[in-house]
């Protein structure tokens, strides 16, 4: 029986949807990891590869059942050989870590990792990880330990925004700090304190014209000696030299989206995140993090939901591989990770 035109159309739509978010191989940990650091590098043969490191998960019990968070030092390389993508373990970080600032080096020959945290506390070390797994420490340490910050690059500069300096902090750091990766010996330069920067897990990025955006995240306050999160929707956009700053808002509060924001034309893309609607409720009943793919137009500040990711995701690296967005593992709901590495093609009209 011939297919009806409607069924043919439906099958075509399904095929397009499936190719729009083609999964890459899972990371070599079936539990998955949150808070990994990753970058797209150029291999010695000119091919784009993905280097990913660190992260954390709960290999035993869930946290609400008394489980312990375990941090990792693994360095994984994802490379396409004979038409097939495959991960392999290439080395170990000097210390297990997660939730660090990260970026590719200006030459795209290494992954820069700054700060982060592990079971012993927050970190201030900065290192460059090569595709062969070698780790080269930089003398330019952060002025203080910093984890759960936003991070992005602007030219050769790595910019780190907000975060905390210790696990029990009841206030977020209120500075952006900058390291020129082309001149790391010059050290970090920090802004004055600014309330807009005092967030953990903010959405941050820079577009292709050098304009900087920071949005969402969580402010922290003291609740009987423990940090209390306040999810924010503020969106601030600063144009290059002297062109002013605009203030706007996200449609809803949002933190911990896969990031940093990926620039394509005059859009910045983010994936998933935590809207805070279930904060303070029993984590075992959490329905899952966001699946939204959002595009922020840096000319109009319009925020569009342009698609749905195949699975919930938060606290994951967001990378650009060719014309695709890629998430590397991440959290699907509190305490639960996914090993999936998923890709989605940026629509031509948004590039």
Language-model features, listed with the residues they occupy:
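Bacterial N-terminal signal peptides
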Residues: 7-17
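N-terminal secretory signal peptides that target proteins for export/translocation
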Residues: 1-5
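Kelch-like beta-propeller repeat domains
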Residues: 20-351
């Amino acid at each position: 029986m011939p297919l009806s035109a409607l069924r043919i159309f439906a099958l075509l739509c399904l095929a397009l949807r499936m190719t729009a978010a083609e999964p890459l191989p899972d990371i070599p940990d079936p539990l998955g990891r949150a808070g990994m650091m990753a970058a797209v590098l150029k291999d010695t043969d000119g091919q784009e590869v993905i280097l990913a490191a660190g992260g954390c998960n709960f290999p035993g019990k869930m946290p609400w059942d008394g489980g312990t968070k375990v941090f990792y030092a693994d360095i994984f390389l994802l490379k396409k050989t004979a038409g097939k993508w495959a991960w392999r373990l290439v080395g170990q970080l000097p210390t297990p870590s997660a939730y660090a600032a990260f970026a590719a080096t200006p030459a795209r020959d290494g992954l820069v990792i700054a700060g982060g945290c592990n079971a012993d506390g927050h970190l201030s070390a900065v290192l460059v990880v090569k595709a062969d797994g070698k780790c080269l420490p930089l003398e330019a340490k952060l002025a203080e330990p910093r984890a759960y910050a936003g991070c992005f690059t602007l030219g050769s500069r790595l910019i780190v925004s907000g975060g905390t300096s210790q696990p029990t902090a009841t206030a977020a750091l209120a500075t952006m700090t900058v390291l020129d990766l082309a001149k790391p010996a010059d050290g970090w330069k920090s802004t004055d304190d600014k309330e807009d920067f005092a967030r953990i897990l903010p959405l941050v990025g820079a577009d292709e014209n050098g304009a900087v955006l920071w949005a969402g995240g969580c402010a922290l306050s003291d609740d009987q000696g423990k940090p209390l999160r306040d999810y924010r929707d503020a969106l601030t956009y600063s144009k290059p030299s002297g062109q002013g700053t605009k203030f706007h808002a996200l449609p809803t509060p949002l933190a911990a989206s896969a990031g940093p924001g990926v620039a394509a034309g005059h859009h910045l893309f983010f994936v998933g995140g935590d809207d805070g609607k279930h904060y303070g409720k029993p984590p075992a009943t959490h329905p899952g993090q966001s699946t939204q793919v959002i595009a922020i137009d840096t000319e109009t500040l319009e925020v569009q939901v342009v698609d749905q990711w195949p699975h919930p995701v938060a606290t994951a690296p967001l990378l650009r591989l060719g014309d695709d967005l890629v998430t590397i593992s991440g959290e699907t709901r509190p305490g639960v990770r996914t090993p999936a590495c998923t890709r989605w093609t940026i629509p031509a009209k948004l590039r």
